[in-house]
């Protein structure tokens, strides 16, 4: 019985951290770390960067759920999450996640560098303060803060390797940030009734036409493409990464056009949501593999 209880708590903790999403963002961070010059660094440093990255992304995600637990209780998709369902103590979650974030910032500053710590703080402020606490329940423009937060792990990965936040760090961050609208809005379209019930003004809920949503996603895909080209021009990524990245950006643009043509169809949006996740993962996977191959043969 005790083992069953432990297993149940662990599953709830994993659910609180949205492990799949956390791992995707962690992968963008680690790819930026590898491409930014981290490949030749001691393996202990890799382990520290990955550990701190996972803890901070998971902690911020869980803290987001702490603040959203009331609206999660109103939405069919989220009402069985650990906090609205009452399986975990909100105060304990709050204390644990805030403590984990603070400790991670301190360790990032002392063990890696101040710029890595700064990226963690940026992600926290834009996700928890700007997106979740101030904007999400008030305006569809909350997506801007959410996008910056989504790009923070990649920003941190580059900063951890290069020891600075420069234009290439910003370009890496932009790739993820411009993917965020497609990630959130396609999902919000599929669960439109849930968001309406919880009175969360996501653009697919409040927009008079799906063209507004499609335009935002399409514009984001164009900026994503330009960011990838910028990294190639700066000799940060290779030609294979350039080709795959531009194709992915074009594919997301096509998803946006199709979304508009189908009038914001919920079932199509769910499929598009899954495709955009795979595309982001593919782009960063190719970047990492090309860098590793180049390092081995050089």
Swiss-Prot record:
Keywords: Cell membrane, Heme biosynthesis, Membrane, Transferase, Transmembrane, Transmembrane helix
Listed EC numbers: 2.5.1.141
Catalysed reaction equations from the record: heme b + (2E,6E)-farnesyl diphosphate + H2O = Fe(II)-heme o + diphosphate
Membrane spanning stretches: 23-43, 47-67, 93-113, 115-135, 143-163, 169-189, 211-231, 236-256, 278-298
Origin superkingdom: Archaea
Record's function text: Converts heme B (protoheme IX) to heme O by substitution of the vinyl group on carbon 2 of heme B porphyrin ring with a hydroxyethyl farnesyl side group.
Family that this chain belongs to: Belongs to the UbiA prenyltransferase family. Protoheme IX farnesyltransferase subfamily.
Protein name: Protoheme IX farnesyltransferase
Species in which this protein is naturally found: Hyperthermus butylicus (strain DSM 5456 / JCM 9403 / PLM1-5)
């Amino acid at each position: 019985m005790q083992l069953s209880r432990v297993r149940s708590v662990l599953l709830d903790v994993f659910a609180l951290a949205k492990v799949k999403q956390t791992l995707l963002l962690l992968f963008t961070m680690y790819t930026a770390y590898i491409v930014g010059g981290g490949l030749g660094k001691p393996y202990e440093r890799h382990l520290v960067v990955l550990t701190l990255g996972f803890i901070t992304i998971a902690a911020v995600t869980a803290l987001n759920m702490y603040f959203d637990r009331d609206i999660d209780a109103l939405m069919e998709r989220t009402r069985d999450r650990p906090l609205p369902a009452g399986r975990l103590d909100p105060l304990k979650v709050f204390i644990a996640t805030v403590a984990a974030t603070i400790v991670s910032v301190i360790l990032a500053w002392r063990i890696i560098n101040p710029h890595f710590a700064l990226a963690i703080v940026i992600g926290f402020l834009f996700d928890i303060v700007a997106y979740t606490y101030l904007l999400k329940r008030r305006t569809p423009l909350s997506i801007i803060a959410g996008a910056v937060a989504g790009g923070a792990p990649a920003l941190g990965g580059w900063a951890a390797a290069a020891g600075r936040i420069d234009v290439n760090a910003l370009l890496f961050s932009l790739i993820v940030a411009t993917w965020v609208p497609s990630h959130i809005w396609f999902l919000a379209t599929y669960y439109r009734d849930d968001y309406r019930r919880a009175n969360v003004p996501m653009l697919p809920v409040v927009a008079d036409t799906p063209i507004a949503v499609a335009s935002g996603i399409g514009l984001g895909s164009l900026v994503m493409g330009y960011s990838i080209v910028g990294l190639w021009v700066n000799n940060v990524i290779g030609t294979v990464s350039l080709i795959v990245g531009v194709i992915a950006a074009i594919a997301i643009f096509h998803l946006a056009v199709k979304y508009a043509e189908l009038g914001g169809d919920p079932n199509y949006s769910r499929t598009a949501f899954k495709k955009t996740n795979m595309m982001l993962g593919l782009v960063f996977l190719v970047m990492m593999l090309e860098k590793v191959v180049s390092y081995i043969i050089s």
